[in-house]
Structures are given as C-alpha cells and as structure tokens.
Design a protein with these regions (language model features):
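Alpha-helical transmembrane segments and membrane-interface helix-loop junctions
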Residues: 1-183
Length: 183
C-alpha cells in the first residue's frame, strides 16, 4: 500500500470520527435543550394550575383556558422527557436476559433493542404526524390553537427517539457508551 493511499485512509477515518463525535455532541445538545424546555414547561404548568386554583377559589371565576393549557403542557413535558430518557438510558429495562449472555451477545442484544426502539420512534413520529395533519383544522377549546398541537410533541419525540437510537447504535459499534446529557 502506498503512502498516499494510507494517508487517504487515515484521513477518511479521522473525518468519520469527527463526524460521529459531532453527531454525539449534537444529540447531547438537543437532549439538554429538551430538558431545559421541559423544566420551563413544568414551571408554566405549575403557574397555570396555580392560577386556575386562585381563580376558582379566590376570585370565584375559573379561567377556562388554564386546564386546556395544562393538559397541553403535560404532553410536551412528557414527550420531550421520554425522548431524553431514551438517550440517557433512563427508561425501564430488563437486564436479566442480557446478564446471562457473553459480552458479544450482550452487545448484539443491545443493538437489536436500539433498532426496535428506533423503529418504534419512527412509527410514532410518522403516525402522530399523520394524526396531527388530519385534525389541524379543528381548534382546542378555550385555547384557539389547532388540535394538531396535541400530536406535535409525540411526533417530535418520535423523531428524537430515532436520532438518539442511532447515536446508541453508533456508540455500541464503536465500543463506546453514550454519556448522559446532564453529566
């Protein structure tokens, strides 16, 4: 093998490494952003529910929009948190089967699991997107927003689950671990 071919191979390897490391950094940044948005959503949720309680018990005039807003915020907080839980391995898992396998078998099983999670995320994004599109003409009572906004967080979460599952598969193939976004 000539020196030029070897140099070209090393260069493409380092370029691939940079791209994969950049992808991991991008996924970590997206996960942190999702968590920040979830925290802001929880704060807004607490404020909306508190205002609803204040209006009902102190002012004797319940703000009708507060409950609808609270339900919508719960969807966003939950779906963003679920996507980040996939990335940061915060979801429920059963390790007993994996523990019985040799190291190579454990890695293969983990890849299969992440492929299944990726498939689930893709289907969730696709079908929730279809639902959002089918109801976008209708309005959420008391908010005046399109009903499609109820399905947007699940669509977004499905897309993020796909991105984060790809990150896990790449990390497993490189014999690395995904570093949780908050560490």
């Amino acid at each position: 093998m000539s020196a030029q071919t070897l140099s070209s191979t090393e260069s493409s390897g380092s370029t691939l490494t940079r791209v994969l490391n950049g992808y991991a950094r991008l996924c970590a940044a997206i996960a942190r952003l999702c968590m920040v948005l979830s925290v802001i959503g929880v704060i807004c949720l607490v404020a909306a529910v508190s205002f609803q309680i204040f209006g009902r018990h102190i002012l004797n005039n319940t703000p009708t929009w507060a409950e609808s807003l609270s339900l919508l915020l719960v969807l966003y907080v939950t779906m963003l948190g679920a996507a980040v839980a996939v990335r940061d391995a915060g979801h429920i898992g059963f390790e007993s089967l994996a523990d019985l396998l040799p190291a190579a078998g454990q890695r293969r099983l983990q890849i299969v699991v992440h492929l299944l999670v990726l498939l689930f995320g893709a289907l969730m994004a696709w079908y929730c997107g279809q639902l959002a599109e089918s109801v976008h003409h209708y309005k959420i009572p008391n908010l005046g927003l399109s009903e499609g906004w109820k399905y947007a967080p699940a669509t977004l979460s499905g897309g993020l689950i796909v991105l984060f599952s790809i990150e896990h598969i790449i990390a497993l193939l490189r014999n690395q671990k995904v570093v949780p976004a908050w560490h």
